């Protein structure tokens, strides 16, 4: 015997009975702290004694489960019938901490017992665990919907029974997590909760004695009233509903903003390039100047750049892009190919001198502040060459738009603008763009008053073919504007195709189909067979209606 243990002898004297007096002695071993000051911390932990109501119809199964529960430190009360279990619960609901019941029961099934428990005011706070040999999802789902805390499939395992106390702990903690007294049992707390009007919430310490005389206590907390729980749940649901509504409204606002931004981007990229012929001429000049910058880089128009602060970032291709040579190429001049204002055209004189004066006034007009300064040269190639004579065809063109000019075919300019609309036109994608032609060439080629294509033909033929190859059809549409729309309508009437890109796509597809058909003709399995032996064996094997049959070996006589 160690020095840290001390034996105390206690004599208990009982009152004399009919059979005579009896003296009993018990030796109590008292463990105190030793010299080294070690204290066993297990004696400070609370000891939980959960009382389980076991409802099982089969006698042997009931005895086995009760024995397992007792080994796991539970106090078990076993009943064979659901009706008896319900009567026991109605009589003393505070004496049960956990209910373990079978689904299939006589007199009252497990579903009915579960429904009765969930409808009772006091018993509904007791965790009910259903058990059965059936493991179907429908059965489990039905039990969970009725309010079961868990579902166990037979045969039960010991670790499952050891963890049953967690259901009681979770249930009591979820009801009132603030106060959790460790020195009172679950059933006594429920009884005091039912008689809380007399005690006014004051609890006394109770000691539950076991069969062996040792004192045990269980940790639980008092139940809360159902009404207060419902009020808390309803308040929490209302707050969650308000939060959900606010989040939904914010989501709708963000979605509307995104849709409006996408619509603006679509209008900026495509629809803004289609202009009607009756718009203001000054707006058309500003839009055309911005189109030169919008050739292959997404820059904003000059009018919008003057108004805005320039905070929005612009899109530019990377340095490895094929369009870099066009995007970063500086624009030497930024001229407008639009005709003069309608008021000026009405006052144009028939003489050549007045025409030259008018053209000089147009050329020396002040450019917009953001655009680079133009050269002081004329719209025409040679400085010494006289200006082209004006004709009476200015007001004779029907439906004249911003710059109604004929499209050149193979770099050949039409002499008469009236014959340009009746002749065969080249596709829109073949016409040069401002990014691939110098400003002087572009202004002289597409100016409506130009009647000298011979002087420009050499300069037009010097245009680099490689540069024109990179220009897309969408860029040409944006550069030429409304005149392309008129040409497309005319070409639709004459029966010509709308774009060369579609023709090239159809030609490539036709060539691919032809190549595929030629390869398919070469794949003739009759001409080349990889395994000759397999072919011979297949021909020798007997067939019945095309299917191979097992060959019967004929027995030869000795």
Swiss-Prot record:
Its main location: nucleus. GO terms for cellular component: nucleus. Residues 180-233, 297-319, 535-558 are annotated as: Disordered. Residues 240-260 form a coiled coil. The expression of APRR9, APRR7, and APRR5 requires the presence of LWD1 and/or LWD2, indicating the existence of a positive feedback loop within the circadian clock. Transcriptional repressor of CCA1 and LHY, thereby controlling photoperiodic flowering response. Involved in the positive and negative feedback loops of the circadian clock. With RVE8, forms a negative feedback loop of the circadian clock. Expression of several members of the ARR-like family is controlled by circadian rhythm. Proteolytic substrate of the E3 ubiquitin ligase SCF(ADO1) complex. APRR9, APRR7, and APRR5 coordinately act on the upstream region of the target genes to repress their expression from noon until midnight. This is Two-component response regulator-like APRR5.
